[in-house]
Amino acid sequence: MEEAFSFAGMAEVPFFTVLSSRPGPGTGVPTYTEQADLRFALGQGHGDFPRVVASPGTVPEAFRLAAEMLSLVWTYQAAGILLTEKHLSESRVTSELDASSVAWAEPVAHSGGEYKRYALTDDGVSPLLFPPSSESIKWSSYEHDEAGITTELAEDIAAMHDKRDRKGAALTEHLRSAQTVNHFGEDGPLILTYGSTTMSVLEALVAGDIRARVVQPVYLEPFPVWEFGDLSDEPAVVVEQSSTGQ
């Protein structure tokens, strides 16, 4: 998985995977749930390249988020991880899912002329071309020029690094208009949590008749820092199902 994820970062392959964590390390406790793979997901693959990581709290949210992330990885030709836990991925629940609420991705398509797989663009996203075509289509895991030809020239390497950085910035800007954080409650102490642990926290608050505000970041990379400006100086309880509080 590590190598494939990094390959996708360099080749700019739309790559989407589901990571469902459980207690580790090693075989661990495979029939129970845990959230110890957060750092593993955020740091997946060697090298610097844009990626998107998001974690749903409920089954309907998992459905919506999976469709949304598929659209993102195709639109931005990036690698993505839907991070969940054994608790959610193996739960049984009856939900009404609105298929009309999701849409097919519409990646930027090549419009004609000489095709450059890694064409330098303002937002870092190169147009895609699909077979059949008389044009040569190259996908390279080696650093490359615009045509996808292997290169070790410093100026080409810098240009492609800058291209990928621009793409990451465009992805982050896109998420500013998306639902990246969920808020529950209007007053009381602040609790931060993510993933399916959110529902456990809300259930515990109801059972204990406790008033609190619960903030659940849905997108973990790029992290929606713009949603946390008003909370940056406020004390909070972080409820996360890992021994180190990743």
Q: Where are the model-predicted features located?
A:
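A broad, low-specificity signal for short, low-complexity segments enriched in glycine/proline
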Residues: 11-17, 40-45, 147-155, 202-203
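N-proximal short alpha-helices
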Residues: 35-42, 133, 137
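Thiamine diphosphate
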Residues: 1-40, 52-73
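Preference for short coil/turn "hinge" residues that link or interrupt alpha-helices
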Residues: 31-34, 47, 213
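A glycine-rich, acidic short-motif signal
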Residues: 44-52
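Flexible, low-complexity linker and terminal segments
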Residues: 65, 70-246
